[in-house]
Structures are given as C-alpha cells and as structure tokens.
Amino acid sequence: MNDRFERLLKSRIGLDASSVGSAVIERAVRQRMSGLALHDEDEYWMRLNGSPGEVQALIEAVVVPETWFFRYPESFTTLARLAFERLPSLGGGRALRILSLPCSTGEEPYSIVMALLDAGLSEYLFEVDALDVSARVIERASLGVYGRNSFRGDELGFRDRHFSEVAEGYQLAEQVRRKVRFRCGNLLDPGLLAGEAPYDFVFCRNLLIYFDRPTQSEVVEVLKRLLRPDGAMFIGPAEASLLSQHGMQPIGVPLSFVFRRTSEAPRGARPKAVSDGARPVVAAAVERASIRPSPPPPAKPRQRLSSLVPPASGQPLASPVGEFDEIARLADAGQHREARAACERQLAARGPSATVFYWLGLLSDVAGQEQEAQDFYRKALYLEPQHAEALAHLAALLAARGDHAGARRLQQRAARGVNKDG
C-alpha cells in the first residue's frame, strides 16, 4: 500500500503513522474497501477524495478507543479540589467550564461529572463539553451503556452509585449523562470551538504522543487557546516535557499531571485545601443551586494492593494496606523523598512487590526521571505481567520516546489481559 493514505490521515487528524504502525492503517483501508465491495486501491482513493463521509469512516476504522472510567484517579481528585477553590471567585456569575478531548466513548467526561458530584458540587455549578473526531464513538458515548472493560481497578463504588445493571452491561444514570454535551471536533481545525468561551479546565490526555513534533506544537497552542489564562490542563504522564517547552508547568500535585501557564503557576504552588466556609459562599451565590453536604471522599483506586510477593522465609505477613496508604498520603502531599523512603522500607521488609515498584515508577515519572520510571514499571510487570496501569504508563513513555512498536506491544498485551478478564 502506498503512503498516500498515511498522508491523508496526517493532514486530516495529525496522525503520525509510525505511532500506530503502517499495518494498522493498511488494515483499516482494506476493511473499508471490503465494506464498499471495492478491490482496487486507486478506485478507493477516488472514493475518499470525493466523499467526506468516507474519509470519516476511514478515520473511525483507524482510531480505536482504549479508555476506562477514572483512569489516573488522582487527576479527578485534584480536579474536585481545584473546582472548589475556583468557585468562590466566580461569584455565581457563571458555571465552571470543563472540556474533554478526545473524549472517545465517554468514560473520561463522565468520570469528570461523577467526580464533581461525588465531591459535593451541585450539578448547576459546572458544565462539561466533550469532543472527538469520530462520530461513531460520540454516538456510543451518548448512549451511556458500558461493558466490563470500562470498569478497572478495585474501587468500583462509583458504579454502584451512578449505574444500573442492564442486559448490555451497565447503564449510566441520567443525572450524569445530561451534564455532558458531546460533539464532533478536530483539533487541527483552525475554527475549533471558535464561538465558545474558554474553559477553566481542559483534559487532553495521551493524544499528543500520536503526533509528530510540529503537529504536537500546533495542538498545544490550540489547547492553550481553548484554556482560560488562569485555567488548568490535564495531560498524560508522558506528555509533561512537551508542555514544559510551551510555557506551561505542573502545579505541584503529584500523580495528577496538571499544568498551568508559567505566569499562573509559581514553582511549587499547590491548590489550597477547601475550607469549611468556602462552600456556603458558593451556595449563596447561586439561587437554588446549593451544594449538598459532601460525602466522605471516595477512596482512590490503587492497583492490586494485596498482590505482594512474600519474602523467601515464607512467614505470614500482616496486611500492608495501611502502609500503602502512607505512601499515597506522602505522595499526594508532595513529599516525594519521604514517599520513596516508605517504598524502600516496604521492599526491605517484605521483598519485591509489583505495587511498590509501580509507585516508584510513578514517583520517578512525575520527577521527569523517565529511564528510572521505565525500569520500575518493568520490575512491576515482571512480578505482575498484566498490571494494567504499569502497562499503560510504560507504553506512554515508550511512545513519547519514539518507540512506537514497543508501545503497541504493551497496548496489545494490556488489551489481551482485559479481554481475558472481561
């Protein structure tokens, strides 16, 4: 297959063919040709050039969504904190505006809504827009019906609160669905959301790694245009260095991958804890939109906290959950050195642990120590080959370094594990 199809996808959606592999694009072309009963590439090429609808169909055959609810859970905890911090300054004049793109089949924007509702924020005080280049996934997202693969990790209390079991899987509650406005959109479109006010928070995670360098720079500038000057952007863990090159820097909340413009984010700045008095101020500002009493914050999902490898002595061990909570507390407080020390104590006391190596990988990732992070993720995967988050983080790091073949192998490995489990 000649590379004209790759060039077309590059021009339309910015896709760097090496990030997914030429075989993926060729398979999508063959799939579309078969669907149209065409046997000649030149004939299909003519059809593409004369049919915007067929271009969209090819894009949808190439873009295969891989997402789940509350991926990178610390991001959603941080979003809730930042939202409560920001609301009093709005004085009830408008709702918080949040953008998710690409939204894929809806797990991310719906997670945003559930996180804010569960944190105690009234549904009248925020609005969520969700964009994707694929009309097909937008249609699926609007239905709000999900299978088991969309629910990963051990903490699934949100599913009990916001979903009902149906024959097809799990149906999302109408209260959550109605808060998201879905639409098709292309980040390379110069007029994208031109008539919309900028957003307080923008989620664009694990997309930039699929672009070449010039397209990455172009897309970052589009995202900055969509973001308020004092807004916050949530990205994927492997994309931090790119944003740092474009006048953005992390706000200092570990494992959340949140950035602001440099002028808005003094080094080491962290969102202030929400005071007890902040919520009544917000409630008074918006008639009928009082904030309901906040339930205790849901526990953060952690990957397989009980999957420890016992030491050689084989002596029974006490439950390590409290010690892992201590690591999480230190990391969330920005005490990285102390969190690392706690991990080292765990390794010395209990022997190799996939969870501890995963935590060390995250801490290295956040610190920008990419090679060290890779080493720790690989150690976690040696002990637990299907550790979903270690696979996802390592794949993102490899893709960011240009090792797209290695990233694809890890993504395929993760998909095999999910299909086996679900």
From Swiss-Prot:
Keywords: Methyltransferase, S-adenosyl-L-methionine, TPR repeat, Transferase. Its EC number is 2.1.1.-. The lineage of its organism: Bacteria, Pseudomonadati, Pseudomonadota, Gammaproteobacteria, Pseudomonadales. S-adenosyl-L-methionine binds at residues 67, 71, 108, 132, 186-187, 205-206. It comes from Pseudomonas aeruginosa (strain ATCC 15692 / DSM 22644 / CIP 104116 / JCM 14847 / LMG 12228 / 1C / PRS 101 / PAO1). GO terms for cellular component: methyl accepting chemotaxis protein complex. PROSITE patterns: CHER, TPR, TPR_REGION. Transmembrane segments: none annotated. Involved in biofilm formation. One of its GO terms (biological process) is chemotaxis. Residues 289-316 are annotated as: Disordered. It comes from the Bacteria. This is Probable biofilm formation methyltransferase WspC. Gene3D superfamilies: Tetratricopeptide repeat domain (1.25.40.10), Vaccinia Virus protein VP39 (3.40.50.150).
